[in-house]
Amino acid sequence: MELPRLENVDLSGKRVFLRVDFNVPVENGKVTDKTRIEKTLPTIELLIKKGARIIIASHLGRPKGQVNPEFSLAPVVETFQSLVKSKVYFSKTVIGEDAIKLSKELKNGEILVIENVRFHKEEEENDPGFSKKLSALADIYVNDAFGAAHRAHSSTEGIARLLPAYAGLLMHKEILELSALLHKPARPFVAIIGGSKVSTKIKVLTNLFDKVNHLLIGGGMAYTFLKSRAIPIGNSLVEKEFEVQAFQLIEKAGVAGIDLQLPVDHIIGDQFNEKAKTKSVDKMGILDGWMGMDIGSKTVSNYEKIIKNAGTIFWNGPMGVFEMDKFASGTMAIAKAVAKSKAKTVVGGGDSIAAINKAGVADKITHISTGGGASLEFMEGRKLPGVEALKKKTSE
């Protein structure tokens, strides 16, 4: 996939509108995970080196088109400032005369971060007038926000049609790594798909079907698959409306020669909290009044053997309720197995990344995708509006 590149563009003295994904967790006014900020630093450093005057835009959370101090980028700017050597300014407005004035006062290599673009409802509406007001801040547009590329918003899609537009280094890397998974994976290709709901993963499972050799299922979504096979699941999470599709996927895997694996044992709890009583049960099923909270040791062992021999691994979604320590062992074991593998490894989704960090093995993963919903949609084979807007620039 060809996207317009920054490397050979003269940016000296030019105002560059850089859309990033600084949608990071903030607690008590402090950023608790800097991963997404750190991932876009190579693009920012390249722009500084080229003498650009950088205007950074991002969203944070869901303020529903209204100014809400809880979702201000101010604490994010504080963290960002500590990671770059350049002078960083913060605009409390997104558009208008004050923001334009600040953008024009920037010197080469300096940075202006504007306030949360979602403080304006027009942002998510991809309003042409709002896109035009954003474009008034800059001469050139760069999109490095792969995590927001699946949204057709003003700052990800609308503005790209009004200014010379380029992809940032992170955007390029994400597209390159995920495209390689879909088109030329080293074999065997193992996909590990977890998380709580089948409904959010059914499309990616379907798209991966003709590409993977092994499909390892875990997390709450596994219980819809097990229920579809009439295996007792007690009070475990189940999406009844997806039972038929889950059963059809199991059947389809058998016909296609894909090794689709489901948990054969479970760590169960009698309630959904840290105070829950726990026990281990095998494939005979889960008792009424109990719910599956993690994969068991036999399942871990089965999955580890497949992971060990993989050529390529894609992991999205935890194996259990890993936020609770007593139900974290399955996810932690899979994280360590993936890290130990000699395969090319790609991990996507907030919970999987949190698990990799919790296990202390992030540095052993080939590529950690910042995408979340965007990487899932890409793996579903869908077109991402933020990427398509850049592609159109290359064909114009």
From Swiss-Prot:
ATP binds at K201, G292, E323, G349, G350, D351, S352. The keyword Kinase applies. Keywords: ATP-binding, Cytoplasm, Glycolysis, Kinase, Nucleotide-binding, Transferase. GO terms for biological process: gluconeogenesis; glycolytic process. Substrate binds at D21, F22, N23, R36, H59, L60, G61, R62, R118, R151. Its EC number is 2.7.2.3. Belongs to the phosphoglycerate kinase family. This is Phosphoglycerate kinase.
